[in-house]
């Protein structure tokens, strides 16, 4: 579950997915 929280934090910080503002986008 800890990995899940880290992923969420990383994703939220990078806003990756449908709205990727990171360039290059390092979010998985």
Swiss-Prot record:
Metal-binding found in the keyword field: yes
UniProt-recorded Gene Ontology molecular function terms: metal ion binding
Keyword list, A-Z: Metal-binding, Metal-thiolate cluster
A Pfam family assignment: Metallothio_2
Endpoints of the signal sequence: none
Keyword field contains Nuclease: no
InterPro entries referenced in this protein's UniProt entry, alphabetically: Metalthion_15p (IPR000347)
Family: Belongs to the metallothionein superfamily. Type 15 family.
Function: Metallothioneins have a high content of cysteine residues that bind various heavy metals.
Protein name: Metallothionein-like protein type 2 LSC210
Species name: Brassica napus (Rape)
Gene transcribed to yield this protein: LSC210
